[in-house]
Amino acid sequence: MSEFPRKAKCVVIGAGIVGNCLVGHLAKLGWTDIVQIDKGPLPNPGGSTGHASNFIFPTDHNKEMALLTLASQRQYIEMGMNNTCGGIEVARNPERLEEFNRRMTSAKSWGIEASLLSPAEVKELVPFINEKIILGGFYTPSVSCVDSLQTGTLMREGAVKSGNLNVFANTEVLDLEVEDGEIKAVVTNKGRIEAEYVVVACGVWSPRIAKMAGANIPLTPAVHQMADVGPIDILQKSNAEVAYPIVRDMDTFCYERQTAGSMEVGSYAHRAIFIHPNDIPSNEASALSPTELPLTQDDFDPQMEQAIELMEMLGDAEIKYAINGLLSLTPDAMPVLGETVEVRNLWSAAAVWIKEGPGIAQLVAEWMTYGYPHLCDPHSSDISRFYPHEKTEHHIYARCDEHFNKTYGIVHPREQWASQRDMRRSPFYPREQAAGATFFDARGWERPQWFASNAKLVEKYKEACQPREHEWDARWWSPITNAEHLAMRESVGMVDLTAFNEFDFTGPDAMKFLQYMCVNNVDVEVGRSVYTPLLTPGGGFRGDLTILRLDTDHFRVVTGAFDGGRDNYWFRRHMPTHGSVVFTDMSSALCTIGVWGPNAEKTMAKIVTGEHKIFDLSQINFPYGAVRNVLIDGVPCTMFRISYVGENGWEIYTKMEHGLRLWDSIAAAGKEFEIIPVGMGVYAVTGRIEKGYR
C-alpha cells in the first residue's frame, strides 16, 4: 500500500458505484494525482451500493435521467457486468394502462424498444404470475441486472493501474478545510491531504461531509424495504441468476426480481422513514452494514401480502434476508451534482442510484474537466438549482415525505406540490387570492396560474377556449387560461412576475464582465436592453435572459424563477476577484407586474409621469426594448417595454413595499378597459406560443 499522501490534485470521498466510476472516468480524461478514500473496507465499504437491487429500467419521462441511464447501461455492457433479462411493469387498474401508453411515447422518444402486453402475454414471459389480477403490462426487453460492486471495482482498479489513483480504505474524513471560499484540504484519521478539488460522492453520508466545509447537499437517507424470499422451486430449476423478466407491480409500488433460487421483493409502499446522516451506525456497530438496518416488519407485511397475491409461490417460501435499506432522497427526486454553491472546487456527486451511476460519474468527470459536461445537459440535477429555503432539513423532509410514495406513482407533469407551500408571496398575493387565483409553486413562490374571477369569460368566448375532453389533458389546467389569453389580446391584462430573479452588476468592469459572459453585445445605450443567451465553455447553450442597462456602469440581469439559482451561481463563479464588479441579488427587494394588450398604453398613460410632467408612452418616445424610470401614481418604478406574450406592453419593477399600491393603481386605471388579472398559464404557455419568439 502506498504511503498516505500529503497532497493531491483531487480527493474523491466515497467508494460506492459513483465514487469508483468517477475516479475511473477522471483517469481516462487525463487527471493525475487522484486520491480516493472511504471509511469502510473494500470492495464493499457499507454504503447503498452494497445492498442495491442492481436492476435497470431505462424508460423515464425525464430526458436527462433517461440519457444518463442509457449511458450507464452502455458502460455496464462494455465491462461485461450487464445481464439483460427484460422487465415488465404490470397494471392492476385502467389508470395504469393509460400511463403505459404515455410511457410508450417516452420510450420511443429516447429510442428504447418497448411494447404493451396483454395479461396472457405477460403470463408467457413470467409463468408464475397471477394474470387474473392484472390488466396488462409494459415490456422493455433491454431491462437488465448489473453487478455494481464489481463494476466499481473494475473502474477503480483501472485507475490504479494507470498510475493516476491511490486508494485508501478504512479512512474516515474528520474535517474539510476551506480558505477564502475555496476547498483547501481533507483531514482524515490517517492525516491531512491538501487538495485542489474534493468530490463528495459518499451517498447517504454526503450532507454530513459537505457541512464540514460549510456547504449544503440537500438530501436525506431514507428507508427502502427489501427481502430475499426462497428457496423457490421454479427459480431453482432455472439454474440461472436471472432467468425471468423483472416484474414491477406498479400499483402496489413493489417489485419482484429473481436472485438465483430466490425472489427479491422490494417496496416503496411503506411509510416514509428517514434517518439523519449523523445517526447512521458505523461499520463496527452494524450487524450487516451501516445502510442495512433491521426490517420494521409491520411496515413490510401489507406489501408482502400483495406480492403473494401476484406470485402465489412466494407464500410457500421463507424470508431469508430482510432489511430497511438506506438510499438517498432529495426534495425534487433528482440527483445533486456539480460544484457546491458555497465552496469553490468542492463538488457533489450525490443522490445517485445504481441505474444511472456510471453515466453520472462520466458526466461529473466531464464537468470538472471541461467546465460543463458533454454527455447531456445537467439542468435538472445541478446542485445550484436549489434556493436557500429548499436546502433546510424542514423542506427536505417535507418534500421527500410527499414524493417517496410516488416512486412508482402516476405523476402528472403539471402536478403541484402539497407540502412546503406559501414560502414566498408577492405583495399582490391578497388581491390575487381575493380574485380566486389557483396558485402553482415556482421554487417557493406562489404564482397564479389562472383566476376564478375570470370564469365568466369562458362563457363569453365559448368554443374559442378550446376545452380539453381528455381527463389527463385537463388535469392541472382550466379553460379560464385560454379565456384570459383572449381577453388580454382584446384589451389589457396584468400579470404577477415577482418570481423573476434580478441581479444588479455595477462597477467599472461591469460591462466588460457581461460582454465576456453573454453572446450578444451588451454595450448598448443607457436605457436600452439586450436579450441574450449564456453559453457553456464549449459553446453549448446554458440559458437565456434579459439585461437592462440602467446606467453607464449599472446593468440589471432578469431571469426566471426556475433558472435563478443556476444563473446566480454561474455569474458569481466567473466574476473577477479584484472588486471591479459588484454583484447584488435584488430578487427579494423587487416585485414585477406585466401589463400587456392593445389597451396597455392607454391604461398606463393615465398614471405614468416623468419628472413632474406627463410621460410620453408612445412607440416613438418609448420604443421596444427601452427602459425608463418613471412614477406610476407616485410610485417610483422602472418600466421596460418588452413582450413575450404577443401584445404591446411593459414589465414594471418597483420595491416590494410599493407593490400593492402599484397593483391597485394599475387595476383602477384599467377599469375603463375591463382590465383583468392574467395567470402564468397565459404568460408562460399560450402567450409565448402566439408570440413565437425565434
Q: Where are the model-predicted features located?
A:
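Glycine-rich FAD pyrophosphate-binding loop
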Residues: 27-49
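Central beta-strand plus flanking loop segment that forms part of the substrate or channel wall
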Residues: 51-58, 89, 213-241, 501-504, ...
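Helical element adjacent to the flavin cofactor pocket in flavoenzyme catalytic cores
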Residues: 138-197
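N-terminal Rossmann-like FAD-binding beta1-loop-alpha1 element of flavoenzymes
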Residues: 8-35
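Glycine/proline-enriched, intrinsically flexible loops and inter-domain linkers
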Residues: 376, 386-694
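Dinucleotide-binding Rossmann-like beta1-alpha1 core, especially the glycine-rich loop
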Residues: 52-125, 251-256, 260-264, 274, ...
